[in-house]
Amino acid sequence: TKPENCEKIIQIKPDFIINTSAITDVDYCEKFKEQSYLVNVTGTKNLVKICKKLECKLIQISTDGIFNGKEENYKEDDEPKPVNYYGKTKLESENEVKNLNDYLILRTNLLYGYISKNTLASRSTYLKRTNFFMWVLTELQQNNSLKIVNDQFSNPTLVDNLKKIIFDSLKKNLVGTFHSTDITCISRFSFAKEIAKKFGFPEHLITEISSKELDQYAPRPTKTCLDCSKIQKNGINLHTLDESLDSLFKVIQKEDPKLIS
């Protein structure tokens, strides 16, 4: 969003740019629309200008949040119908990226992964937010009970898997829009139960509630599971939730064993 930063990118002359920058807090976007637009849309517009000037590829990380959640297993060409301001900004940023000849839009959802205490301590206040997986695991480790919604479905995606998807897609020189998630469609409640089971915590600490009981500020789509068959047909390997949790278990067992029961 700052011209001086754009100039620095131009001086580097990259072969490609990966745009992971976004305000993703749905309620925050609904409350602070001007700032959210600046980061999510204006920032993307600036990167598009840079890529046009340098003739380099732009990889845009997008979201399931552009859909309204009323259909099953969304494909790339299904009509976007965002139900909140966050989704609207991400859709507008996608449309900006499509003005380029060489672009890659990767739609993902519910990104999660392990974040060490040292990493969290070094972050700014906003970035101290963790992710659904870390929140659930930390609460269970402290023997706290959790109320989790049972009517919001998506494909939880391990961030390390998305990283590999990005670079595999670059190697194959993919162009266009692709759904890029882990392949298990699951509710938040069931996801939390799977975390408890994998890491050895009592599942009875987790009880289910409906989204209405949360009284969230911004509306949420209910079921935004993505069909990833297009990217799989292009030779990109995807993972199940069980495979991803197994991978995380090994990492945490080595890095932070206190998080395992």
What are these regions (language model features)?
Residues 17-21, 58-64, 68, 106-108:
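SDR active-site strand-loop-helix element
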Residues 98-153, 161, 167:
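NAD(P)-dependent short-chain dehydrogenase/reductase
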